[in-house]
């Protein structure tokens, strides 16, 4: 059917529409029938019958190349190579990052970036993470699954890039752990003494669901941070950690955070110390479902000072932490909790 259209749209608009047509008949008709009469265009006998609207796809945070076509599915944070085709599935935070600097929730590079001192849902020197926190790696070069799986751990491993780690990091201080607690002496879901382990193991270098080193925090970090969790030189949080605490699912290093990563520069879903891993791996430079590097991000990353949902040297988060904090979990020079923390960490957040 042909319709006469007058002063209805611009040529460019129709051309845009024609791009979604099953054939070129519309655009060829436009080119053939539209007279150029200045700003006002008159369209005679323009074929508009077969135009279609672009399909709307739902993707929460899908970072793919535009040319990819994805089947409808729910992915909270799926970061794959553009050439990948994914079947519908649910992934809470699947983030792979081949680079030492990524971020997630994944936020586009800016979703949250952190540096020097940041904080964010996630923060890291430059990262941030997803509060979800899992699928993270930790260890000087390891990671673990918050649940502890989906992750590799070793001084340096991690699936492809699922997590990279290198240099040295720690996610959670020489002594941390989380879900596992680690302080020179803590334990928790995981226990860690200068060397313990738990769901996660941690030795002077462990990690936990989160690890913590003298100062990290997770979901929150603290050197001094705060965030959803707040952290302070000493903070506390949903979980608080003190000289040595831990929390749940949080790792903390001198300065990390968890759900957030923590290391001098890491982050985690959780990262962990010189050598830990977790669902998250962390190295001086890793990333994990989030990767973290000296500057990574993770669901939250944290660097010397970041915080995020996690906070580091100076951040705060859902969780607050103070030199001595307490919270849903309290931790003292040496405590543990669902989260353990070392010299200074806290959970759900590491420090």
Swiss-Prot record:
Region called 2 X 15 AA tandem repeats, residue ranges: 124-153
2 X 17 AA tandem repeats, as annotated region: 91-123
Glycosylation site list: 40
Propeptide, residue positions: 24-47
Start-end of Basic residues biased regions: 92-351
Sequence repeat residues: 59-74, 75-90, 91-107, 108-123, 124-138, 139-153
Start and end residues of each stretch annotated as Disordered: 57-351
Keyword Glycoprotein assigned: yes
Signal peptide feature range: 1-23
Region described as 2 X 16 AA tandem repeats: 59-90
Region (18 X 10 AA tandem repeats): 173-351
Other remarks in the entry: In the intraerythrocytic stages of development of P.lophurae in ducks, there is a synthesis of a major protein that accumulates to comprise at least 50% of the cellular mass: the histidine rich protein.
Stated name of the protein: Histidine-rich glycoprotein
Organism in which the protein naturally occurs: Plasmodium lophurae
């Amino acid at each position: 059917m042909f319709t006469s259209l007058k002063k209805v749209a611009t040529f460019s608009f129709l051309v845009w529409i024609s791009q979604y047509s099953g054939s070129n008949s519309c655009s060829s008709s436009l080119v053939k029938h539209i007279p150029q009469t200045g700003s006002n265009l008159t369209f005679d006998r323009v074929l508009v019958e077969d135009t279609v609207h672009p399909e709307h796809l739902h993707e929460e945070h899908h970072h793919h190349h535009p040319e990819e076509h994805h089947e409808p599915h729910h992915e909270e944070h799926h970061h794959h190579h553009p050439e990948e085709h994914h079947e519908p599935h649910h992934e809470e935070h699947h983030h792979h990052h081949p680079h030492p600097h990524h971020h997630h929730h994944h936020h586009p590079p800016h979703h949250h970036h952190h540096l020097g001192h940041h904080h964010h849902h996630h923060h890291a020197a430059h990262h941030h993470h997803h509060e979800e926190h899992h699928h993270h790696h930790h260890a000087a070069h390891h990671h673990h699954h918050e649940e502890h799986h989906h992750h590799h751990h070793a001084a340096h491993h991690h699936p492809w890039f699922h997590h990279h780690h290198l240099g040295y990091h720690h996610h959670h201080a020489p002594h941390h752990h989380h879900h596992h607690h680690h302080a020179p002496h803590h334990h928790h879901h995981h226990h860690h003494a200068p060397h313990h382990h738990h769901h996660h193991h941690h030795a002077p270098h462990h990690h936990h669901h989160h690890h913590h080193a003298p100062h990290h925090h997770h979901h929150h970090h603290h050197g001094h941070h705060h965030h959803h969790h707040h952290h302070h030189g000493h903070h506390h949080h949903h979980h608080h950690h003190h000289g040595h605490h831990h929390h749940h699912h949080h790792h903390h290093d001198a300065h990390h955070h968890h759900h957030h990563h923590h290391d001098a520069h890491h982050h985690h879903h959780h990262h962990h110390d010189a050598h830990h891993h977790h669902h998250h791996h962390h190295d001086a430079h890793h990333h994990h479902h989030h990767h973290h590097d000296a500057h990574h991000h993770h669901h939250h990353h944290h660097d010397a000072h970041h915080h995020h949902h996690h906070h580091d040297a100076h951040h705060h988060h859902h969780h607050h932490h103070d030199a001595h904090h307490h919270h849903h979990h309290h931790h003292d020079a040496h405590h543990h909790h669902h989260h353990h923390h070392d010299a200074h960490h806290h959970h759900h957040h590491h420090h």
